[in-house]
Amino acid sequence: MKVTLPDFERAGVMVVGDVMLDRYWYGPTSRISPEAPVPVVKVETIEERPGGAANVAMNIASLGASSRLVGLTGIDDAARALSQSLAQVNVKCDFVSVPTHPTITKLRVLSRNQQLIRLDFEEGFDGVDPEPLHERINQALGQIGALVLSDYAKGALASVQQMIQLARKAGVPVLIDPKGTDFERYRGATLLTPNLSEFEAVAGKCKTEQDIVERGMKIIADFDLSALLVTRSEQGMTLLQPGKAPFHLPTQAQEVYDVTGAGDTVIGVLAATLASGNSLEEACFFANAAAGVVVGKLGTSTVSPVELENAVRGRAETGFGVMSEAALKEAVLAARKRGEKVVMTNGVFDILHAGHVSYLANARKLGDRLIVAVNSDASTRRLKGDTRPVNPQEQRMIVLAALEAVDWVVPFEEDTPQRLISEILPDLLVKGGDYKPEDIAGSKEVWANGGDVMVLNFEDGCSTTNIIKKIQKNS
């Protein structure tokens, strides 16, 4: 088994399926409405994230592969928001606009980390002419190494059989994350990736490993599949292929925070790895490692090449660098067992300059290990505006991890790192600038745990904003 990452940059993948926009409204609630016995939420933060097939496409793009997305949308603000969000992460969208239907949108209202209600805005696309989708697939088949069909039963894959046959005729593997119990719809696919409950809904309850193997092989034969991958949560995943022994991979998840979107990550990594020229067994190996990373994050997430490389090389256990939250907790625990003092700071670190380097070096001198928590791209946009960050999250983390002063780099999605700090609980929390210690996010949690909080001065004359202005002035 190879442990070097696939050459994702040479991979081209098309995703066809049910695209949707996930909207999140966050805010505090402190009273009950006088109109009805329901809480009143004062909305303070609004987030929009691509969902469904769009999340699969984002997972492929996050690896550095060429990612194309085809689906059905309305002609509305949600469709425009989807296109803009996906363009920012290098997903090439080729939507079919249907003027009679709205773009599928799911709105969630949350307060104090609890979802209060979900509102679905959708109208099934069943009955919509599938020919424009077929045309887009045909045009791309000579330029892609894999086709993913992402089925959420919203109508985009009503003609899934024709799509499978188009790809088979061109010799392009077809990977499908199935929906429902009618696997006949997917006859002739290269690979189906049901989770255990989806598998058992078709095959029946499995009491033993042998039951899974025997019933899985029957499904392969009955529906003319090339392979079947059963994802089994904490039990890992099992690949079944005709004429080959079952290939089982135990889970690599160190700690599970959220399984949202894990299936999208699995099929995205599978497709990108196959399109890179690797075997199906190798694709499962990398997909399993990626799943172990993504469930260690909160919310729907993607996996970067750096995170995937760390996972397959075991750097989370023995080394340093960019890490998931779950891996970082393990590394910090090991450091404390060695009697090391852990220092933590945070920031955007968009364009790294001398002031940053000096500040991080000074922070590192205050302890034995330095953690740098980095705002994700979405978090940075909310904090700094739509023109930021200049450098994407992965590049910012790679540069930080290369600094001698920095031991661990971890991203966070929220507006502040308060939740992350409360999970890590460093011995010393450091922030640069003119903050008061009590105003620093996470300070109360660190103090309550017996730690310290300190403010360090930034080097005069060094500012990312000033650098950007200077570049703009000279361009």
Swiss-Prot record:
The protein's superkingdom reads: Bacteria
Q: Which reaction does it catalyse?
A: D-glycero-beta-D-manno-heptose 7-phosphate + ATP = D-glycero-beta-D-manno-heptose 1,7-bisphosphate + ADP + H(+); D-glycero-beta-D-manno-heptose 1-phosphate + ATP + H(+) = ADP-D-glycero-beta-D-manno-heptose + diphosphate
* A GO biological process held by the record: ADP-L-glycero-beta-D-manno-heptose biosynthetic process
One cellular component term from this protein's GO annotations in UniProt: cytosol
A GO term, aspect molecular function:
phosphotransferase activity, alcohol group as acceptor
Renumbered residue ranges of the record's region Cytidylyltransferase:
344-475
**Major enzyme class:** transferase
The subunit structure is:
Homodimer.
Q: What is this protein called?
A: Bifunctional protein HldE
Native source organism of the sequence: Cronobacter sakazakii (strain ATCC BAA-894) (Enterobacter sakazakii)
> Species lineage, top-down?
Bacteria, Pseudomonadati, Pseudomonadota, Gammaproteobacteria, Enterobacterales
Which gene name belongs to this protein? hldE
